[in-house]
Amino acid sequence: ARAVGIDLGTTNAVVAVLEG
């Protein structure tokens, strides 16, 4: 569960950067 949370958090951060 923790690993999944980290993966989701990383994905959200990347998406935020791509969206600007």
Swiss-Prot record:
**Keyword Lipid biosynthesis on entry:** no
Keywords of this protein's UniProt record, alphabetized?
ATP-binding, Chaperone, Nucleotide-binding, Stress response
What does the record give under GO molecular function?
ATP binding
* Coiled-coil portions: none
Q: What induces it?
A: By stress conditions e.g. heat shock.
Q: What does this protein do?
A: Acts as a chaperone.
**Protein family membership:** Belongs to the heat shock protein 70 family.
Q: What is this protein called?
A: Chaperone protein DnaK
Q: Which organism is it from?
A: Mycobacterium avium
